[in-house]
Curated annotation (Swiss-Prot):
UniProt protein name: Carbamoyl phosphate synthase small chain
Top-level taxon: Archaea
ATP-binding as UniProt keyword: yes
Active site (record annotation): C242 (nucleophile), H321, E323
Domain named Glutamine amidotransferase type-1: residues: 168-345
Species the sequence originates in: Thermoplasma volcanium (strain ATCC 51530 / DSM 4299 / JCM 9571 / NBRC 15438 / GSS1)
Region CPSase, residue ranges: 1-169
InterPro entries referenced in this protein's UniProt entry, alphabetically: Anth_synth/Amidotransfase, CarbamoylP_synth_ssu, CarbamoylP_synth_ssu_N, CarbP_synth_ssu_N_sf, Class_I_gatase-like, CPSase_GATase1, GATASE
PROSITE patterns (alphabetical): GATASE_TYPE_1
Length: 345
């Protein structure tokens, strides 16, 4: 089955289709992670995006369904050089091709991903389709104009998770992955809500945590969350990861911007001026450091200087993923820092 990758600049690439027969549309981005492909594909921050794996070989070890970061694959499509689509090992008994068919996600293999990564780095992310017939006329709307957070997290009633000794955290889920499990391991009690919840009606918590998520943090659909965070500056301790850092920064009055091709992968170096860490990233937006006034930037990306760690009075947030999944555990100290700042360390 032949499939085609059609980009907004007119480039058309052909390859071997696998997974679902469906066609797909999204923002074409790449990840530099060499392993952890299942965790990557199931990260809700990828909603609205088609993913290129910079690593040429994918799915060369068996699927472990317990390592999924959400309830399913979140990328719109995946583009690979050499996917082992029929690999079936051990007791898992799942082929990659079969799994993607069940998830309704198309893949296209045999693509020169090295060339494609260079193209994205040079030109920025590209709106693209994976199609079965490239002869049709196609429109290329901006996926970031959509309310991607609602696609990642449907509205639900608040969920209470009882911990043992770590205090109670209001967990604003904007597309969380493994962070929820990490906070449970820290013995926090959690009140889990989504962005459509009336946050002002929730009571009985000691701190507020804002999760990662997809899309543009300044999207109008998130205005109620930003307003709520703004009203709680200096009232409750605020914490955030990735998208959460951006949302908190907006609440303080800072600005965010869209990056040329973003940071995605489990091998990004971050420095605080004293220590350096290897971290996992998945974001296409960042905080404009020149607009920061009422909090401090205390960590930066070692390659391009992107804002990575911020702190203020009763506020602490990171742009990277200390829970990794996939990736290194250099920054798991973040969760201990949360407990210390809340007063339960």
């Amino acid at each position: 089955m032949k499939k085609y990758l059609v980009m907004e600049d007119g480039t058309v690439l052909s390859g071997q289709g696998y997974g679902s027969y469906k066609e797909a549309y999204g923002e074409l981005v790449f990840t530099t992670s060499m392993t952890g492909y299942l965790e990557t594909l199931t990260d809700p921050s990828y909603v609205g995006q088609m993913l290129v794996f910079a690593s040429p070989t994918i799915a060369n070890y068996a699927l472990e369904m317990g390592k999924m970061e959400s309830n399913g694959v979140k990328v719109s499509a995946l583009i690979t050089k050499d996917a082992h689509i029929e690999l079936k090992k051990g007791g898992y008994g799942r082929e990659f091709d079969e799994f993607l068919k069940e998830q309704g996600i198309p893949g296209i293999d045999g693509i020169d991903t090295r060339m494609l990564v260079r193209k994205i780095r040079a030109n920025g992310v590209l709106r693209s389709y994976v199609v079965n017939d490239p002869s049709h006329s196609l429109d290329f709307p901006d996926p970031m104009n959509d309310d991607l957070v609602s696609k990642a997290v449907p509205h639900h009633d608040p969920v209470f998770v009882k911990g043992e000794e770590g205090g109670t955290v209001l967990f604003i889920d904007l597309g969380s992955k493994n962070t929820l499990k990490e906070l449970m391991l820290q013995n926090f009690s959690l009140i889990v809500v989504d962005k459509q919840t009336n946050l002002d009606e929730i009571e009985g918590y000691d701190a507020i945590f804002v999760s990662n998520g997809p899309g543009d943090p300044s999207h109008p659909s998130l205005s109620n969350v930003i307003k709520f965070l703004s009203h709680n500056i200096g009232v409750k301790p605020l914490f955030g990861i990735c998208f959460g850092l951006q949302a908190i920064s907006l609440a303080y009055g800072a600005k965010t911007y869209k990056m040329k091709f973003g940071h995605r992968g489990s091998n990004h170096a971050v420095t605080d001026g004293t220590h350096s860490y290897v971290t996992t990233h998945n974001h296409g937006y960042a905080v404009d450091g020149s607009t920061v006034k009422d909090f401090k930037v205390i960590g930066w990306d070692a390659n391009d200087g992107t804002v990575e760690i911020i702190e203020g009075d009763d506020m602490f947030a990171v742009q990277f993923h200390p829970e990794a999944s996939p990736g290194p555990h250099d920054t798991r100290w973040f969760f201990g820092e949360m407990k210390r700042r809340i007063g339960y360390a």
